Amino acid sequence: MLVLLSCAKTMSAVSKVKVPLTTSPRFQKEAAEIALQMSQFSVDELERLLRVNAKIAVENYKRYQAFHAETTPELPALLAYTGIVFKRLNPKDFSAEDFGYAQEHLRLTSFCYGLLRPLDVIRAYRLEGDVVLPELGNQTLFSYWRSRLTDTFIEDIRSAGGILCNLASDEMKSLFDWKRVESEVRVVTPEFHVWKNGKLATIVVYTKMSRGEMTRFILKNKIGTPEELKGFSWEGFEFDESLSDERKLVFINGMGE
């Protein structure tokens, strides 16, 4: 089974965690070209393009200006992203075996690097899928990547057993020809809901935390089938058979009943 996670907006360039090996991103050339185009924008332009405040725009202006320098720090992707999902995944205590398993069974989306393996070394950046770069065909990055990633993604899923556990946010489907993905491999999407005022609700922060915890559960326990995945339990979230089906595994937290 292959797990798909979304990239995070927040990144670090420093980590004390040791990994057994590192690899180069498979779409390094494309990433370098995208970063080069992004380096042409001013701070004000980045603020508008990325819909961020001035401080974040300045930070990413500096990142893009230094992106191609030999001295710019790099980190394995699994350590570089620092959002809620990755904090809960918490690879700090991963063994060499855990990292090796993750390399084969986890993929991370990236608007700059396309599709990443956990040990692919990357540089910090900030980007959105709806950014249009005229030099790359005047199309959104979603469109730019779709034709480039789909074959590789399907091959990765097949190599990992032919089942995709989709723990990425919904917008990431647009990076791939998703209909083709669903027609060629089995896709299972876990959902996380809580009872609130007598109704089922989706709370974003709980969803992100649960995605990270589930990914950790899969990698640490070498979970290979949706049936095994039903055994996931965390902070009150339990599998609910009545709300689930072949494509959707629903986990419910009854704290607000």
From Swiss-Prot:
GO cellular component: cytosol
GO biological process: response to hydroperoxide
UniProt cross-references to InterPro entries, sorted A to Z: YaaA (IPR005583)
Pfam families with a match to the protein in the record: H2O2_YaaD
Signal peptide as annotated in the record: none
Covalent S-S links between cysteines: none
Similarity section: Belongs to the UPF0246 family.
Protein name from the UniProt record: UPF0246 protein BT_3869
